[in-house]
Structure formats: C-alpha cells, structure tokens
Amino acid sequence: MIQPRKELDGVLLVDKPTAHTSHDVVARLRRKLNMKRIGHAGTLDPMATGLMILLIGKATTISQYLTSLDKEYEGTIELGKVTDSQDADGEVLSTLPVPPFTEAEIRAAMAGFMGDQYQTPPMYSAIKVDGVPLYKTARKGGEVEREPRFIRVSSFELTRFALPQFDFRLRCTKGTYVRTIAHDLGQRLGCGAHLAALRRTATDKFKLADALTLDAIEALPLPEIEKRLIPVYQAAPSIVG
C-alpha cells in the first residue's frame, strides 16, 4: 500500500527515455512521490530523449517562465525518406535517391534555417484547430490548414557527416518543431528527409548532464530525491522574490 508522503516543492531534471511520452514521465514521478501536483516545462516527442524539467508542487507556478526558455538539441537527420510524422516513428511516405552531396552543400542548406522565421506546425502535433488536436485529424487521414508560428534558430551546426545521415546541434526558441526543420531541409535538398534521432541537451541554464534517468530516480529514497530538487527561487530568480 502506498503511504502518504511529504509534499515536495522544486524543479527536478530528468533524462527522458525513448518510447515514453512526456505524460508517461510525469505519471511515473507521480507514482514515485505519491503526489499529483507535478507538471513539466516542455514536451518531448516519444521518440526523443533527453532533458525534461519536472515541476513539483509550488514549482508548477513557474511553468510559463521555464517553458519560454530556449532549448538545445543534438540529433540525426536521414535523407531520402519522408514520413508522415516527420520522424522515425512515422510511416514512410516516399523514398528517393540521395545525391552525392558534399559536406559544404549540407552546411549551406542548414544555414538557410538560421535566424527568425515562421514555421508551419506538423499535422502530427498536439496543437488544436477548432478544439481538435491535429494528430487526431492526421490519424484519420485528414489535413487542415495550420497557422505558421514565429520561431528563431540561433545555431544549427553539422557535427557528423555520413550520408544518407548527418548529425547536428541546434539551439532554438520554444515551440520549434525540430522534426519539421528536418522535413523542410529535405524538401529544399530535393530528396526528402526525416528526423532519425533527437536528444534535448539543455533548456537555457538547465543541462542534461545534471539530470537523472527515470530508473535512477525511482530507485532513490525520498530524502535523496529531495536533495536533487532545485528550489523555485533558484530556478526562476527573475520572477520569484
């Protein structure tokens, strides 16, 4: 029988495993801590891994601030395959031959995604149109017009070149769909592409290196978890007096 536990307050950095939704992560932590007031500051797709900022107790009050911070990612883009979800979890819609691009050509194409821009969200997303999440419409084979959203990409670097794949490092504003950048890059190159892997490495000052895996957190006694919590005033010093 689960015993009532001390109510905790603070920010906990978690390394999300693949094949978990962001809701799955929150649910596991709620069971571990036996408390409901737990949220997060930025969704990761099931395929993606890496940093999730979990908000426990009173830390849920700074959700909007933490969600607004820039994110950093490392990932892999695969050329030649287009999927319906724009990532490796989706069904392949088309396969095209990949031209013998040079590293310089890939870097030049990536440079075209730098700076301020408007991005059309993918159909496989939780954004609602007329009250219906886009992914529900997409699963039924439908498609609706989506309003482009402002984003900013402040860095987009090539870190490994091995066609048909290449690795990258990216820093962007909230609400940026990295898989859409991968898809759109493939369209510009004329051979299609999808996001093959993604790992969030930072959200502003919060780093993946300081996070624990879910399994590690679940194995810790409550006092040890409490020691890992970042106080609310420290997580958001500019808005907490």
Swiss-Prot record:
Record's keyword annotation contains Amino-acid biosynthesis: no
Catalytic site: 45 (nucleophile)
UniProt keyword annotations, A-Z: Isomerase, tRNA processing
GO BP of this protein: mRNA pseudouridine synthesis; tRNA pseudouridine synthesis
Pfam families: TruB_C_2, TruB_N
Gene3D superfamilies (alphabetical): Pseudouridine synthase
InterPro entries noted in UniProt: PsdUridine_synth_cat_dom_sf, PsdUridine_synth_N, tRNA_psdUridine_synth_TruB, TruB_C
Catalytic activity: uridine(55) in tRNA = pseudouridine(55) in tRNA
GO molecular function, one term: RNA binding
Enzyme Commission (EC) number: 5.4.99.25
Keyword tRNA processing annotated: yes
PANTHER family per record: PSEUDOURIDYLATE SYNTHASE TRUB1, TRNA-PSEUDOURIDINE SYNTHASE
Family affiliation: Belongs to the pseudouridine synthase TruB family. Type 1 subfamily.
Annotated function: Responsible for synthesis of pseudouridine from uracil-55 in the psi GC loop of transfer RNAs.
Protein name in the entry: tRNA pseudouridine synthase B
Native source species: Opitutus terrae (strain DSM 11246 / JCM 15787 / PB90-1)
Lineage, uppermost ranks: Bacteria, Pseudomonadati, Verrucomicrobiota, Opitutia, Opitutales
